[in-house]
Curated annotation (Swiss-Prot):
The modification N6-acetyllysine is found at K7, K69, K288. Belongs to the lyase 1 family. Argininosuccinate lyase subfamily. GO terms for cellular component: cytosol. Catalyzes the reversible cleavage of L-argininosuccinate to fumarate and L-arginine, an intermediate step reaction in the urea cycle mostly providing for hepatic nitrogen detoxification into excretable urea as well as de novo L-arginine synthesis in nonhepatic tissues. Essential regulator of intracellular and extracellular L-arginine pools. Pfam families: ASL_C2, Lyase_1. It comes from Macaca fascicularis (Crab-eating macaque). HAMAP family: Arg_succ_lyase. This is Argininosuccinate lyase. Coiled coil: none annotated. Pathway: Amino-acid biosynthesis; L-arginine biosynthesis; L-arginine from L-ornithine and carbamoyl phosphate: step 3/3; Nitrogen metabolism; urea cycle; L-arginine and fumarate from (N(omega)-L-arginino)succinate: step 1/1. Its EC number is 4.3.2.1.
Length: 464
């Protein structure tokens, strides 16, 4: 049990710890997030001790009852921290002793805070991954529903931020939804690797007291058991993977936010954010600022920083547990909170977004059909490279004459290639343009419908 100082490790120390060091060393301010899973892990471990003959049935029941009381106090916000509670494990064990007496000292038999904390963290992150998966699926569903409802809306697609080709608005939505399905799949994979039990590894060498780790695994519903006690207590691959998942997901969300920030400017006027996700200016009354999207974009940087910071912490550590690993939890808690907020705000933005169909249509221009003009010649038998050059000459001719590409006469086009004929007029129809891209993954309606079905099927599979 704890020494007179209240420390779980104080037996070989003489004198008090410097108060500045006390504060520097403590993690209770943030690892209190783990109170519930710490109790959960301790209850499972007490059952393991009872099976190993290290606790009597009465002692186990006493500990379990005491842990239930500890959990009740946390849940009701009546748990009182002590100045000596340097972390959640110390706090819970100290309170357990106050409730049930010296029997509490048997709970830590064969267990180290090294395997205890990493078990707690895996339990907490496992639940967090499930919660975030649900939020991410809801965002993707919202996007797919919107894509299905607005399939007939056309607007300019951009490359290099220059107008490129006509596409369906739904095609743009789905481009981001598909990226997010990879994120949702990746998060499930991260959760699978989180779901491995380290409890029973001790500090470094393992557990010498015949504690049944399979029992612990079943009690805590883990999918597997760690293979090596040294690796189990010191590796934080699962934390790094989670932070990388968040970084990549935020990359995708930030890019979508950037598109929408541009689209809602007066210069584009393709979309309008709901007032619920906008703010105003303290000086300029006319302003409607896309703060929700700007914050999504900026919070990506915070998440990246947490990921990079953890990797910098891990890369120089010697084998097994080092106190440096205390830094992992703040990163996990902050990023989890950020991702939860971002996913919910993004869902709200997408579900309430207003589109300006007329402005989208007016932004389409004949020069965006230059590629279609080349395809017209390809269908007439011209090799694509020659067709590309011929279309480029038509663009140059229109620019020289100061007219739109579709205003060139048939005779003028025929000076470029005799393959041009009266049916070239069909090239200038935007609806015809998007419908020719019928290959799977394209912007034709049939392909967009296929994409919608595929994304919904992916979601169904992931949620199974």
């Amino acid at each position: 049990m704890a020494s007179e100082s209240g420390k779980l490790w104080g037996g070989r120390f003489v004198g008090a710890v410097d108060p500045i060091m006390e504060k520097f060393n403590a993690s209770i301010a943030y690892d209190r997030h783990l109170w519930e899973v710490d109790v959960q892990g301790s209850k499972a471990y007490s059952r393991g001790l009872e099976k190993a003959g290290l606790l009597t049935k009465a002692e186990m029941d006493q500990i379990l009852h005491g842990l239930d009381k500890v959990a009740e106090e946390w849940a009701q916000c009546t748990f009182k921290l002590s100045p000596n509670d340097e972390d959640i494990h110390t706090a819970n064990e100290r309170r357990l002793k106050e409730l049930i007496g010296e029997t509490a000292g048997k709970l830590h038999t064969g267990r180290s805070r090294n395997d205890q904390v990493v078990t707690d963290l895996r339990l907490w992150m496992r639940q967090t991954c499930s919660t975030l998966s649900g939020l991410l699926w809801e965002l993707i569903r919202t996007m797919v529903d919107r894509a299905e409802a607005e399939r007939d809306v056309l607007f300019p697609g951009y490359t290099h931020l220059q107008r490129a080709q006509p596409i369906r608005w739904s095609h743009w939505i789905l481009s981001h939804a598909v990226a997010l399905t990879r994120d949702s799949e990746r998060l499930l994979e991260v959760r699978k690797r989180i779901n491995v039990l380290p409890l029973g590894s001790g500090a470094i060498a393992g557990n010498p007291l015949s504690v049944d780790r399979e029992l612990l695994r079943a009690e805590l519903n883990f999918g597997a058991i760690t293979l090596n006690s040294m690796d189990a207590t010191s590796e934080r691959d699962f934390v790094a993977e989670f932070l990388f998942w968040a970084s990549l997901c935020m990359t995708h969300l930030s890019r979508m936010a950037e598109d929408l920030i541009l689209y809602c400017t007066k210069e584009f006027s393709f979309v309008q954010l709901s007032d619920a996700y906008s703010t105003g200016s303290s000086l300029m009354p006319q302003k409607k600022n896309p703060d929700s999207l700007e914050l999504i974009r900026s919070k990506a940087g915070r998440v990246f920083g947490r990921c990079a910071g953890l990797l910098m912490t891990l890369k120089g550590l010697p084998s097994t547990y080092n106190k440096d690993l205390q830094e992992d939890k703040e990163a996990v808690f902050e990023v989890s909170d950020t991702m939860s907020a971002v996913l919910q705000v993004a869902t709200g933005v997408i579900s309430t977004l207003q589109i300006h169909r007329e402005n989208m249509g007016q932004a389409l221009s004949p020069d965006m059909l230059a590629t279609d003009l080349a395809y017209y010649l390809v269908r007439k038998g011209m090799p694509f490279r020659q067709a590309h050059e011929a279309s480029g000459k038509a663009v140059f001719m229109a620019e020289t004459k100061g007219v739109a590409l579709n205003e060139l006469s048939l005779q003028e086009l025929q000076t470029i290639s005799p393959l041009f004929s009266g049916d070239v007029s069909c090239v200038w129809d935007y609806g015809h343009s998007v419908e020719q891209y019928g290959a799977l993954g394209g912007t034709a309606r049939s392909s967009v419908d296929w994409q919608i079905r595929q994304v919904r099927a992916l979601l169904q599979t992931q949620q199974a």
